[in-house]
């Protein structure tokens, strides 16, 4: 696809600029991603506000409603370092029945992890408490996110699930979410290691950049040397290739055993926090989560994260709607509504 080639060229430009000392990579990539502007829908009233210290953009239908509307709060993707509230799937929402909040959490590396997750919790809590002032039914609020935004949506729902001082989140929509950092040798990692916008090495490098770690740790992490055997044994009931349906394991080859490197584990401890790897949450949390829709793409290194979380939710009797895009790839949502970057597909009808 021309759009993929163009974005790869832009990333090459960002890498070259960084190597020459012209501009840091994350700064230039942020400028590039923010430069792709979606069209604003004329039927919307748009307001820029703050929920606590978190900037948000509110999209309210201009047409009157006889009853309170449903609400959506979106956390954008971008590895916690890129992206903004100025673009996302807002062009594709059915505005006559929804009010829409897009949250701009503070970005890494300027703001250290877990600032991003905490900002998402702050914005969501504020919206749940004040929804009626925006004409929204507080019992019909959906939390939504794509990629890293899907991580933040997942961890936000987990963190708020047992709160009794705020309304319950009605549902979560997770679009090709990143959900675990224990195993980077799942079938989708092997199959899609060099496919599309998000290669396996690029993903792990972005993880390390987000956590303000050195990308020289990438090789050890890809090999699994950051995980002690005790942790592998503890979590294999939730994260293991055997839990992936057989039809998704074509040509899968089990990796060679990795030698544990304690220094790498110490350097990457944040990766095992449930805010960062929500798949590690205990059943006592997962079993109380709201109805969930998970969207996965076949040509995506993160496909199996979604499949594993789907299984965990279903095993805990949480209602799950699963939509799998056979021709989809990681980041496809970013191209919706950008003229030559638009994708006429069934994807839009799922929202």
Segments the model singles out, each with a brief description of its role:
Residues 28-30:
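Extended alpha-helical scaffolding regions
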Residues 4-19, 23, 35-351:
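Alpha/beta-hydrolase superfamily serine-hydrolase fold, recognizing
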């Amino acid at each position: 696809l021309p759009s993929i080639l163009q974005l790869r060229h832009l990333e090459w430009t960002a890498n070259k600029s960084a190597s020459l000392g012209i501009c840091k990579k994350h700064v230039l990539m942020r400028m590039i991603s923010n430069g792709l502007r979606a069209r604003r829908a004329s039927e919307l009233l748009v307001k820029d506000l703050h929920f606590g210290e978190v900037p948000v953009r509110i999209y309210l239908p201009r047409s009157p409603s006889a009853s309170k509307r449903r609400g959506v709060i979106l956390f954008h993707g971008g590895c916690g370092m890129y992206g903004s509230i100025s673009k996302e799937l807002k062009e594709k929402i059915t505005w006559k029945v929804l009010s829409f909040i897009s949250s701009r959490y503070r970005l890494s590396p300027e703001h250290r992890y877990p600032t991003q997750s905490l900002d998402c919790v702050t914005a969501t809590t504020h919206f749940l408490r004040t929804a009626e002032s925006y004409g929204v039914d507080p019992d019909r609020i959906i939390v939504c996110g794509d990629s890293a935004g899907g991580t933040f949506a997942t961890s936000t729902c987990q963190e708020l699930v047992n709160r009794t001082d705020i309304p319950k989140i009605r549902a979560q929509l997770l679009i090709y979410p990143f959900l675990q950092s224990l195993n980077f040798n799942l079938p989708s990692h092997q199959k899609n290691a060099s496919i599309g916008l998000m290669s396996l090495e690029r993903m792990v490098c972005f993880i390390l950049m987000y956590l303000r770690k050195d990308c020289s740790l990438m090789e050890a992490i890809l090999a699994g040397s950051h995980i002690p055997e005790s942790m592998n044994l503890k979590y294999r009931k939730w994260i293991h290739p055997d839990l992936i349906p057989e039809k998704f394991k074509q040509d899968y080859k089990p990796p060679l055993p990795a030698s544990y490197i304690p220094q790498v584990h110490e350097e990457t401890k944040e990766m095992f926090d449930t805010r960062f790897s929500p798949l590690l949450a205990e059943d006592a949390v997962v079993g109380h989560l709201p109805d969930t829709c998970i969207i996965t793409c076949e040509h995506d290194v993160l496909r199996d994260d979604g499949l594993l979380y789907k299984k965990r939710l279903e095993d805990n009797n949480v209602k799950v709607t699963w939509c799998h895009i056979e021709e989809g790839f990681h980041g496809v949502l970013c191209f919706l509504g950008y003229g030559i970057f638009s994708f006429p597909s069934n994807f839009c009808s799922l929202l």
